[in-house]
């Protein structure tokens, strides 16, 4: 691995105006969506900030392995330039990170020390992305936003290390990404694609079979289901949430403003699974206060209808419904600007897009 040092542009296209340190008091009333509550924020190299978790044999799964996290990170586009998402000494055991491969921001993993590198899937720079690496006994699998992005033959057992685990760094590879990491989960079982998709948009705060630890980074580096608490250390590290606003303003060429509080955007892709999205969806037609349309390819070819419904009087939730006339991949992002709560929906390519009828979407009433 190699690193290019120097001044880094720290990202977060949606948070340029505000960088607010999070206190535990603030977090008490934060609703849950994607990402969840607050997140770990990193300034990128040459800063050194990260979360350190003391060594424990449980952090070295050997027979089966799943690592997953939400990330919104950047690295340098020149050279190979690898940055750590998390690791337990890449020279001896496992490491998950972002590397520039062929000019693309690529998910890389090591599961058996320094000779075990595998590249598969691309991580959108500065855009919240769910990444997962799975070992099921015979294969290593990379997932991006629930899509299988790489499959590699792998035999067990996985190797171990007595080094501490780090999030945002590694004891043998200290270059830090710029951006944010949230909801880090480590399992000693192989999670399936269906299990990843069913749970990456839900908080986990109770023990489950095979779940070793969960670090939600809601103002601290505690493990919320077990004893593997971490601690932030170094420079340029902290916790953030989305900034809040009185309203979402007006609908723009690329963003719907619904019910005066929900900023809704979409991105689409026709390239292979696990690669970067091709473009931003454009607002189509004439939206109203509660619903609107998006187009991908041309103004006379509408793709998605989305609406936000006030269900507060029924189940104390705002509802998000959508319908699409497409079979391409897209991601639909809904941000409640009043509370700084986001929900992301994915449509996977191939079959016609199913309708979304999410009556529990956002617990942000009134």
Which residues are covered by each model-predicted region?
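Extracellular/lumenal carbohydrate-interaction signature centered on repeated Trp-anchored short motifs
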Residues: 55-67, 120-129, 157-160, 173-180, ...
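Extracytoplasmic low-complexity segments
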Residues: 2, 25-47, 57, 197-246
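Polar/charged low-complexity regulatory segments
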Residues: 246-366
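Aromatic-rich beta-strand patches that line glycan-recognition/binding surfaces
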Residues: 67-68, 78-92, 167, 197-200
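Extracellular glycan-interaction patches encoded by glycine-rich segments
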Residues: 45, 54-56, 112-113, 161-182, ...
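Bacterial N-terminal signal peptides
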Residues: 14-27
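Extracellular, beta-strand-rich glycan-interacting domains
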Residues: 66-75, 175-201, 212-221
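Extracellular glycan-interaction surfaces
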Residues: 34-47, 68-78, 94-157, 169-172, ...
